[in-house]
Amino acid sequence: SECLVGSEMCIRDRAVTTIVSTDMAAPVAKKYGVELRRTLTGFKFIGEQIGKLEAEGRADRYIFGFEESYGYLSGAHVRDKDGVNATLLVCEAAAWYAQQGKTLLDAIEALYKEFGYYRNALCSFAFEGESGMHTMQNLMKNLRANAPAEIAGYKVESAVDYDTDGTGLPRANVLEYHLAGGHKLMIRPSGTEPKIKVYLSAVGESEAAADAVNAALSKAAAEIMKV
């Protein structure tokens, strides 16, 4: 984060990520005064945000975009993930920290100590056969009708239904549960395959603590999916 923005930070610079990407981006962006926008899953939506800034004559205010499935882009030169750009960013960061006698591992550990150990995981549940899609539809319908009060022992403090809640994003068949402790679980059926993806996000004072939360959330997700 320090390497990317450093002394070049300007008020209302914008970073963009997706709703299923790490929540660690929010406190980092807040520290540096960066506006963080979240989009639906898919780098094309990040590209749309660049286009909106360009239409406002503010394309230079876009500084970075990323998604959980390893897509990165700094600068507004393209509207898609850029592997070469990402590689150069890693090299630049490694060199920047090396000048301070640090490694990239030192840098990420410092971020964890400052903001908390954020750990993400993805569970995928298949619903095969002719009845698979129907089963998925019923499962999502039941979750909307009977919202859980707790998941894995963590109270559901708030829930977002991206299909109905007026999030400012295009409607999507996604349910998001914010849990006590800053943890999160999201449920998103695939639009092309008979499977449901469950995204887990945990934060703790150590890597082991966050991983333990995700392990509990994973078991709870399997129970919800009845797998």
Where are these regions (language model features)?
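Single conserved hydrophobic/aromatic residue that forms the stacking wall/gate
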Residues: S1-G6, C10-I11
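Phosphate-binding and adjacent anionic-ligand microenvironments
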Residues: R12-R188, K195-Y199, S206-V213, S218-V227
